């Protein structure tokens, strides 16, 4: 009877050890899977950050200003290139953008406010057509009220006919 008890005790101990090892190996697999998922998430976050940095670099190169011809709200090829850089960044995050329309000093105050608004709206419409939600875009017109270049020459006026992207 004592021998049988020792044998069943040993059997129980072996069964217990096998069960314990099996349980531990299951946790190891879960831990490995968890660590792998965390590693992938970190890699994805790092890649997203690198992509956003590349887009910000592209915006720095393209600029934040879209220029317009005299008495026009039609975007130029260069203006579309600037807007495209901002669109690419806006499509990677949930930030909003403010488009500030400006004019040169020629024309009445009322006319220039309306022209600045048409310019800001032209850029907004281009962004919306290219995938940016209109709810993320604010437009405002300053008309001739906030010039970047003082003077009454074509060189000054051309710098003031713009939409600033904020």
Question: What are the functions of these language-model segments?
Answer:
Residues 2-13:
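Bacterial N-terminal signal peptides that target proteins for export
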Residues 2-3, 83-85, 150-151:
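A generic local structural motif
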Residues 5-6, 72, 107-110:
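A short, structure-level motif marking secondary-structure boundaries and short turns
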Residues 19-23:
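C-terminal motif of bacterial Sec signal peptides marking the signal peptidase cleavage site
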Residues 25-97:
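Periplasmic peptidoglycan-binding/tethering modules of Gram-negative envelope proteins
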Residues 102-166:
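Periplasmic OmpA-like peptidoglycan-binding domain that tethers envelope proteins to the cell wall
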